[in-house]
Amino acid sequence: MPTIQQLIRSERSKVQKKTKSPALKQCPQRRGVCTRVYTTTPKKPNSALRKVARVRLTSGFEVTAYIPGIGHNLQEHSVVLIRGGRVKDLPGVRYHIVRGTLDATGVKDRKQGRSKYGTKREKAKK
């Protein structure tokens, strides 16, 4: 604990909060252009081919973003919307692509949790 004299000499410094998604620059989402679309493998206990894209954002950052859902139509020069949210078993992937906006189509044949994958409601069959 500091003495009164030490506090007079220099006041207590505020603790700076470090953001988990700096490329968004305090915005909820950011637009960007895909520079590379590829698959990568997850960390040790898991095994898969995860779909990711390298995206150049309007904020000037180039980030790696995860493409959620089964199947996608993204390729180089696709314009996408990025939101925050990391993928735990992919190191360095701290952003998600928003499905159903701009060039990223929604997931086909999705029945549950549709809002997270940009899928419209199916018409009721008679």
UniProtKB/Swiss-Prot annotation:
One biological process term in Gene Ontology: translation
Pfam families according to UniProt: Ribosom_S12_S23
SUPFAM superfamilies, A to Z: Nucleic acid-binding proteins (SSF50249)
Taxonomic superkingdom: Bacteria
InterPro entries: NA-bd_OB-fold, Ribosomal_uS12, Ribosomal_uS12_bac
GO cellular component, one term: ribosome
UniProt modified residues of type 3-methylthioaspartic acid: D89
UniProt biased composition (Basic residues): 113-126
Keyword Membrane recorded: no
GO MF annotations in UniProt: rRNA binding; structural constituent of ribosome; tRNA binding
Keywords tagged on the record: Methylation, Ribonucleoprotein, Ribosomal protein, RNA-binding, rRNA-binding, tRNA-binding
Region: Disordered, residue numbers: 1-28, 104-126
Keyword Kinase: no
Record's function text: With S4 and S5 plays an important role in translational accuracy.
NCBIfam families according to UniProt: rpsL_bact
HAMAP family, alphabetized: Ribosomal_uS12_B (MF_00403_B)
Family: Belongs to the universal ribosomal protein uS12 family.
Subunit structure: Part of the 30S ribosomal subunit. Contacts proteins S8 and S17. May interact with IF1 in the 30S initiation complex.
Protein name per the record: Small ribosomal subunit protein uS12
Organism: Synechocystis sp. (strain ATCC 27184 / PCC 6803 / Kazusa)
